[in-house]
From Swiss-Prot:
Gene3D superfamilies on file: Urease, beta subunit (2.10.150.10)
CC per GO annotation: urease complex
Cysteine disulfide links: none
Source species of the chain: Cupriavidus pinatubonensis (strain JMP 134 / LMG 1197)
Catalytic function, reaction form: urea + 2 H2O + H(+) = hydrogencarbonate + 2 NH4(+)
Annotated compartments: Cytoplasm
Protein name, as recorded: Urease subunit beta
GO molecular function: urease activity
Encoding gene (name): ureB
Family indicated by similarity: Belongs to the urease beta subunit family.
Length: 101
């Protein structure tokens, strides 16, 4: 083994297998691109993103860790979200929750 070497299992690895997911249609109503990272609490994203916020409370993008989705000005797209796991306590981001979900 080499330090830092990854030894992945053979075949495909499904991200977030068995976790609760939801799809939401999002429109960027602003005049600047908005990028949302993989672990950002989607409910607390930039106010220029228009979507059903209450439906996204406790969810993040269902994408690989360390990646992001970019919403161009005027763009509308549907994204898949996955429920936050663990203790489901949210601090930071835009300060809209600051505690248990």
């Amino acid at each position: 083994m080499i330090p830092g070497e990854l030894m992945a299992a053979d075949g495909e690895i499904e991200l977030n297998a068995g976790r609760h997911t939801a799809s939401v249609t999002v429109a960027n109503t602003g005049d600047r691109p908005i990028q949302v990272g993989s672990h950002f609490h989607f409910y607390e994203t930039n106010a220029a993103l228009s979507f059903d916020r209450e439906a996204t409370r406790g969810f993040r993008l269902n994408i690989a860790a360390g990646t992001a989705v970019r919403f161009e000005p005027g763009q509308t797209r549907t994204v898949e979200l996955v429920a936050l796991d663990g203790d489901r306590i949210v601090y930071g981001f835009n300060g809209k929750i600051m505690g248990a979900l």
